[in-house]
Amino acid sequence: MDKLADLNYTLSVITLMNDTLHSIIQDPGMAYFPYIASVLTVLFALHKASIPTMKIALKTSKCSYKVIKYCMVTIINTLLKLAGYKEQVTTKDEIEQQMDRIVKEMRRQPRMIDKLTTREIEQVELLKRIHDKLVTRPVDVIDMSKEFNQKNIKTLDEWESGKNPYEPSEVTASM
C-alpha cells in the first residue's frame, strides 16, 4: 500500500515508461510522441489512483457492486473528458434520479403557471377598477336630485297659489 501512494515510485515508473518509449521509437521526428506519452501518463496515474481507492471502498462498503460501478463510471467519464468528449456515461440510478427531478419540475410548472395566471387576472381586474375610477366622464346635465340641500325645494308650478314664499314682500310699519 505504501508503494502505491509513494510519489517517488510513481515518478520513477513514469520515467521508465518514457525511457522505454524513447528506446522503442528511434525516429526523432515523431510528432505524436508527446501526446502518446501524456496519455500513458494519465492512464498510469488513473490506475494508481483508482486501485487503492477501490480497495479501501470495497473493504469499508457493504455494497461492493455499487462502489465498483460508481468507480468505473467515474474513470470512464474522466477518460472521455480527457479525450475531449462532452458526453458522459451515467448509471441507471442517476438516470432515474434525473427523471424524477424532471417529473417533479414538470408537475411544479403548471402549479406555478396557475398561480401566476391568477395573480395576473387579479392585477388586471384591479387596474380596470382603478382606471374606471380615474376616467372622467363628460357631464351634459347635472343631476341635482341627490344633493342634500335640494331635496325639499318646490318648483314654481308646485307652489301654492303660484307665489314664491321666499320672495320678500312689502312690509309697512306704523310710526
From Swiss-Prot:
GO terms for biological process: monoatomic ion transmembrane transport; symbiont-mediated activation of host autophagy; viral process. GO terms for molecular function: channel activity; metal ion binding; toxin activity. Its main location: host cell. Disulfide bonds: none annotated. The keyword Membrane applies. Keywords: Activation of host autophagy by virus, Calcium, Enterotoxin, Glycoprotein, Host endoplasmic reticulum, Host membrane, Host-virus interaction, Ion channel, Ion transport, Membrane, Metal-binding, Secreted, Signal-anchor, Toxin, Transmembrane, Transmembrane helix, Transport, Viral ion channel, Virulence. It is a single-pass type III membrane protein. The keyword Calcium applies. Glycans are attached at residues 8, 18. It comes from the Viruses. One of its GO terms (cellular component) is host caveola. Residues 52-175 are cytoplasmic. The chain crosses the membrane at residues 29-51. It is found in: Host rough endoplasmic reticulum membrane; Host membrane, Host caveola; Secreted. Homotetramer. Interacts with the immature particle in the viroplasm. Interacts with host CAV1, early and late in infection. Interacts with host integrin ITGA1/ITGB1 heterodimer. Interacts with host integrin ITGA2/ITGB1 heterodimer. Interaction with microtubules blocks trafficking to the Golgi apparatus. Binds 1 calcium ion per tetramer. Plays an essential role in the virus replication cycle by acting as a viroporin. Creates a pore in the host endoplasmic reticulum and as a consequence releases Ca(2+) in the cytoplasm of infected cell. In turn, high levels of cytoplasmic calcium trigger membrane trafficking and transport of viral ER-associated proteins to viroplasms, sites of viral genome replication and immature particle assembly. Belongs to the rotavirus NSP4 family. This is Non-structural glycoprotein 4. It comes from Rotavirus A (strain RVA/Pig/Mexico/YM/1983/G11P9[7]) (RV-A). The lineage of its organism: Viruses, Riboviria, Orthornavirae, Duplornaviricota, Resentoviricetes.
